[in-house]
Amino acid sequence: MVYGYQDASLRRICRAVGLTTGALYKRYEGKDSLFAALLEPTLIALDQYGQEQKRRDYAFLEEGHLSDMWAHRLEDLQSLMRILYEHKDIMQLLLFKSQGSSQADFRMRLPHLAADETYRYLELAYKEGKINHLVKHEFLRSCMTAYYTAVFEPLAQDWPQEQALEFCHSIMDLFDWGGLLGF
């Protein structure tokens, strides 16, 4: 973790855990597959969080209660922040020390995926007449990138979890998603 992906040495890792490099290569194809295995539980936790949010938001759309999405957004953001802090070391590695790995673009890829998913949702809501304005996709992407930059900032600054949870209030004040998205 100290060295980050690019400066990590498989020999040094093997020495630290008492393995031979041959034993490591029997299980992992190389440094990137070892890195992927290290990240997997964290990525699964993030995906599960995202899937839960998606299910709930689509239920609001189906019921015609889009504005109810905003009722628990602070709690949702704090839940996400808790997940990030449950996996703090791995998240810091992934976000800030993954250069050279297949996940080096994660910090940019996540907001783009979130924007794409949100845009599909908005298109459906617009087609169904549940919203009367559709934000431009590129604007949404830029806003999502700014949002996730703010969400990841406590990890970048290595703040304690309580301070990160408190910062969620500021993030919510800064990002008026209901105003931007029109509901």
Task: Please provide the spans of the model-predicted regions.
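Short hydrophobic/aromatic patch on the recognition helix
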Residues: V17-Y28
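Hydrophobic/aromatic-rich alpha-helical bundle segments in the mid-to-C-terminal region
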Residues: L122-L174, F183
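Short, hydrophobic secondary-structure boundary micro-motifs
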Residues: Q92-L94
